[in-house]
């Protein structure tokens, strides 16, 4: 029978419940258990795909095409388990399903209420992902005390009652703030948070204390006493420089030991040598590479979470340190990139910042600075090449302008922006890509066909492929039917490669995405080359 672990948060949001859940998944998998992670999000949006990146961060795409919370990216990167759409559940999707069933008459005229109908649907979604795994870790988003998460907490409480104490446990992540003027660490917020959680009928089995420093035994003893949790089940999780150090820190604090004991998992010690060996590569890195992300969603760094993590993975693999810089495409200046070792132009939507990206890509192309384009980055590269190499001065995308006849980037044939469900109408999920032989891309992937995740509705217009190819642009990756351009590249350049897909979603710390890996190799080897001076 599957064992269930619910992870809740208290005091403030953004404490790292996702990293805690991912780290626990890592440790349990290292104990030879089969695991799966899940995120319950309390917002009313059915999916996060149309949410503002400044508010929500990036949208993570799963293999089966679900647009999900960015925490699923953490889960996959820490555990290596590819998740499905049922790994992310929102309040909006729950209510929509219940209302649909009510309209069909499935409730036989009953008065539809939060309890039992909403909570029953939540429980169905929680249980529906497990299949035959040993342990399921379900993170409940939000903060205890928020009105939005009450149905999720009630559903979790009912599950412990229905499945038994031995099969369901709760981990509560809280904050122990340091008060500067009095130089004290305060446990009162944690005590109040646990008290509130108990008011909902849930007593945490383990409390994870987030802090900006290591906590002494007195603090842990105090929390143990006032929150009625055994001392060994009070886990200190101080801030660390690298999130990939968290699993080892959690292990040293005894998190997986406490879970193993509480759920009677009867497992051996975790095998963590591979993870330790991966982290040891950081100590062998002596050279810095200056890489910039040229984008437009900089109000929240999480907007490009998977891109940043993929760069870290590649740097780790190549024994170099990442010196990451951020360049706003709205305020781009050539001086910003003239001394860089490489630039990534990631995905995005809308016309804002586009001309800055196109101008920057021209500079990168002409000055032989390594360039990696992703999704929108590929589209901007094609527009730049069409304008400045092919002589199509009005080249543009139909997404950005309707005042031109030269749409080198246009809607996919099956796309319809007038559809009611705009977000779900994109080309989403894993699709095959046929690699062109004797290209840089073929060296990167070493496979004739690869499978990568997509999230787009615009593509290279096939009407312009011939003129682009005649002028030197290489289509190094195509859909199996040759109708969609998946990758482009240039010869006689250290690295000028772009993809319509999102390689960052499949990158792992121990196995970097091949495109990012080659990009960092090129950036490191092309340092100190002569470049055009900026006036």
Tell what function each PLM region has.
Residues 532-535:
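Conserved small/polar residues in nucleotide/adenosyl-binding loops
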Residues 227, 259-269, 389-393, 519-527:
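Short, hydrophobic alpha-helical segments
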Residues 1-320, 330-342, 349-350, 357-363, ...:
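Flexible phosphate-sensing "switch/lid" loops adjacent to ATP/NTP-binding sites
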Residues 18, 22-26, 30, 342-432, ...:
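Cysteine-nucleophile active-site neighborhood
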Residues 487-518:
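A glycine-centered loop/beta-turn motif at secondary-structure junctions
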Residues 437-492:
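Catalytic beta-strand/loop cores that center a nucleophilic Ser/Cys/Thr
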Residues 232-239, 325, 478-481:
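Beta-strand->loop->alpha-helix junctions that form or flank phosphate-binding loops
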């Amino acid at each position: 029978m599957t064992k269930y672990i619910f992870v809740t948060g208290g005091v403030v949001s953004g404490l790292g419940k996702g990293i805690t859940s991912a780290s626990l998944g890592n440790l349990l998998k290292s104990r030879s258990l089969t695991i799966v992670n899940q995120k319950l999000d309390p917002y009313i949006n059915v999916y996060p795909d149309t949410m503002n990146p400044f508010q929500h961060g990036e949208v993570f795409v799963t293999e089966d095409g679900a647009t999900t919370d960015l925490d699923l990216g953490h889960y996959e990167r820490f555990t290596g388990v590819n998740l499905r759409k049922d790994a992310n559940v929102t309040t909006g999707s729950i209510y929509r399903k219940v209302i649909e069933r009510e309209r069909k008459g499935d409730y036989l005229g009953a008065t539809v209420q939060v309890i039992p109908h909403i909570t029953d649907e939540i429980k169905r979604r929680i249980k529906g992902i497990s299949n035959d795994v040993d342990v399921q870790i379900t993170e409940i988003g939000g903060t205890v005390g928020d009105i939005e998460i009450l149905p999720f907490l009630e559903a979790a409480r009912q599950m412990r009652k229905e499945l038994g104490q031995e099969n369901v446990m709760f981990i509560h992540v809280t904050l122990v703030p340091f008060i500067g003027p009095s130089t004290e660490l305060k446990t009162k917020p944690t005590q109040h948070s646990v008290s509130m959680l108990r008011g909902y009928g849930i007593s945490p089995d383990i409390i994870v204390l987030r802090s900006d420093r290591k906590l002494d035994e007195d603090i842990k003893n105090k929390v143990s006493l006032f929150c009625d949790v055994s001392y060994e089940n009070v886990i200190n999780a101080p801030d660390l420089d690298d999130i990939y150090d968290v699993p080892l820190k959690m292990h040293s604090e005894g998190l997986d030991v406490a879970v193993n004991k509480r759920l009677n998992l009867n497992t051996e010690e975790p095998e963590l040598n591979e993870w330790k060996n991966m982290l040891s590569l950081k100590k062998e890195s002596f050279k810095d590479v200056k890489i910039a992300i040229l984008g437009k969603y900089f109000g929240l760094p999480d907007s490009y979470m998977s891109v940043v993590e993929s760069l870290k993975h590649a740097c780790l693999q190549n024994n170099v340190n990442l010196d990451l810089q951020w360049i706003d495409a709205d305020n781009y200046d050539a001086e910003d990139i003239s001394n860089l070792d490489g630039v990534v132009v990631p995905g995005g939507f809308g016309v804002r910042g586009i001309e800055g990206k196109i101008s920057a890509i021209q500079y990168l192309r002409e000055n032989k600075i390594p360039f990696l384009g992703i999704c929108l980055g590929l589209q901007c590269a094609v527009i730049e090449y069409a304008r400045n190499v092919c002589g199509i001065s009005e080249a543009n995308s139909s997404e950005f302008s309707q005042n031109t006849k030269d749409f080198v980037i246009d809607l996919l044939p099956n796309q319809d922006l007038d559809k009611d469900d705009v977000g779900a109408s994109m080309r989403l999920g894993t699709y095959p890509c046929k690699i062109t032989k004797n290209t840089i891309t073929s060296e990167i992937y070493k496979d004739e066909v690869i499978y990568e995740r997509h999230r787009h509705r615009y593509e290279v217009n096939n009407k312009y492929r011939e003129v682009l190819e005649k002028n030197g642009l290489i289509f190094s990756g195509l859909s199996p039917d040759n109708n969609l351009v998946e990758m482009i590249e240039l010869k006689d350049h250290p690295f000028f490669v772009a993809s319509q897909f999102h390689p960052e979603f499949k990158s792992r710390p121990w196995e970097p995405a091949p495109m990012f890996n080659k990009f960092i190799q090129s950036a490191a080897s092309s340092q100190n080359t002569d470049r055009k001076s900026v006036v």
